[in-house]
């Protein structure tokens, strides 16, 4: 395994495979994509969303019956970009296994709970945080009013979807997301954000379908 610098200065490991045709090098993320594993390991913006959506659509077209594993370590980011990923997860045919490693906060936590019910997971020492959407506006009074209405709409939409995915009453979601609400993996399981806390013994196997936890 070697490594190189990508355009934003991050080190991306390279994997070299040997065959009868010679050597072929892949960056580690492309190699894992062949095993139907996607990584969301950055704040969420339009560029990140476009990449994640493209990978989801590619794997859907390649095999509609095999699970896709989405590993999440993200502090959140753009609500609109996150909703693009969310809607794609809901629309594609394969089950999407979501796995939190490190931190899933804000839109990261929202995408974690958006995975296929029974297949939403977290490593034991991860942290999960939900809160209301952030926003700000400046300009003329009418412009600020327009932005305020949009933020309130997004807040109501996200709260309702969180209630749907977790099984919590909407009133509790509204209260808990009023400020940053941090949870351990076990607390997130009890809350309904995830279905199981995993360890080495039950870590999903690459390329294999995961049994739904009821």
Curated annotation (Swiss-Prot):
Q: Which GO terms describe its cellular component?
A: cytoplasm; endopeptidase Clp complex
Q: Which domain of life is it from?
A: Bacteria
What are the record keywords, sorted? Cytoplasm, Hydrolase, Protease, Serine protease
Q: What is its EC number?
A: 3.4.21.92
Active-site annotation? 106 (nucleophile), 131
Catalysed conversion reaction: Hydrolysis of proteins to small peptides in the presence of ATP and magnesium. alpha-casein is the usual test substrate. In the absence of ATP, only oligopeptides shorter than five residues are hydrolyzed (such as succinyl-Leu-Tyr-|-NHMec, and Leu-Tyr-Leu-|-Tyr-Trp, in which cleavage of the -Tyr-|-Leu- and -Tyr-|-Trp bonds also occurs)
Q: Does the keyword NADP apply?
A: no
Q: Which CDD domains match?
A: S14_ClpP_2 (cd07017)
Where does this protein chiefly localize? cytoplasm
Gene Ontology BP, a term: protein quality control for misfolded or incompletely synthesized proteins
Output one GO MF annotation: serine-type endopeptidase activity
Cellular localisation: Cytoplasm
Q: Which family does it belong to?
A: Belongs to the peptidase S14 family.
Q: How does it assemble?
A: Fourteen ClpP subunits assemble into 2 heptameric rings which stack back to back to give a disk-like structure with a central cavity, resembling the structure of eukaryotic proteasomes.
| Its job | Cleaves peptides in various proteins in a process that requires ATP hydrolysis. Has a chymotrypsin-like activity. Plays a major role in the degradation of misfolded proteins.
The name of this protein is ATP-dependent Clp protease proteolytic subunit 3
What is this protein's gene name?
Answer: clpP3
């Amino acid at each position: 395994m070697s490594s190189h610098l990508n355009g934003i200065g991050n080190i991306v490991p390279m994997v070299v495979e040997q065959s009868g045709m010679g050597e072929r090098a892949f960056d580690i993320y492309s190699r894992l994509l062949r095993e139907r594993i996607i990584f969301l390991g950055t704040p969420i913006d339009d560029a990140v969303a476009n990449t994640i959506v493209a990978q989801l659509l590619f794997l859907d077209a390649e095999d509609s019956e095999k699970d896709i594993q989405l590993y999440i370590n993200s502090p959140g980011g753009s609500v609109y970009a996150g909703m693009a990923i969310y809607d794609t997860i809901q629309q594609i045919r394969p089950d999407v296994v979501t796995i939190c490693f490190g931190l899933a906060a804000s839109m990261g936590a929202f995408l974690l709970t958006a995975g296929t019910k029974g297949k939403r997971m977290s490593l034991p020492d991860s942290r999960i945080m939900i809160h209301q959407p952030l926003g700000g506006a400046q300009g003329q009074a009418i412009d600020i009013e327009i932005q305020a209405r949009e933020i309130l709409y997004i807040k109501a939409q996200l709260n309702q979807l969180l209630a749907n995915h977790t099984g919590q009453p909407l009133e509790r979601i509204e209260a808990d997301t009023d400020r940053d609400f941090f949870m351990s993996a076990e607390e997130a399981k009890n809350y309904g954000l995830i279905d199981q806390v995993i360890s080495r013994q039950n870590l999903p196997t690459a390329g294999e379908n995961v049994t739904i936890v009821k």
